[in-house]
Amino acid sequence: RAGRMVRWATGLDLLHESNPLLGFGLGRFGGAVAMQNKIIEQNEEFSYFYMDNYYLKTLVEMGYIGLIAFIILLVGMSLWCLRSIGRTKLCETDRTRVLAVSLFSGMCGVMVHCYFENIFEVPYMMAYFWSMAAAVMYLGYFRKKRR
């Protein structure tokens, strides 16, 4: 099993063989949890491997409903972050805006990286990602002092 395209095609085949709306089952395919637990016995037709695409892994495990919910979460978080960055114009210093933009840029990099790696499976990465999201949103609430 070499190459991402073969892995992605295998994942999509498995999704459509199971339930496309609800998926194959959380933690049962394409990632670290599935590799460690091995709930399903491996044979010639099925073997465990890393999906190397977190969004596609989410689609296969949770179906179209789960992927749509996850994308809504990420888009909503991104919109809130952009709104907070826009509100940093009201801050006393430009440093707040630079910090907010820098944190959001890092988050965008992680979201793009998820197309090529299961980066969200790493607990530290998830903690850093959602902490950065919270920090960006918080920075949008700083205000200039009234005189």
Residue ranges and their predicted role:
Residues 1-10, 17-62, 85-88:
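Long extracytoplasmic/lumenal interhelical loops at the membrane interface
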Residues 2, 14, 20, 77-84, ...:
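Hydrophobic membrane-targeting alpha-helices
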Residues 7-10, 54, 58, 77-80, ...:
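Generic recognition of well-ordered alpha-helical segments
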Residues 21-25, 67-69, 121:
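Extended hydrophobic-aromatic, low-complexity segments
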Residues 29-31, 58, 69-72, 123:
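Generic hydrophobic alpha-helical membrane-span motif
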Residues 61-111:
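Hydrophobic transmembrane alpha-helices and their immediate junctions
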Residues 101-147:
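Transmembrane alpha-helices of multi-pass inner-membrane enzymes
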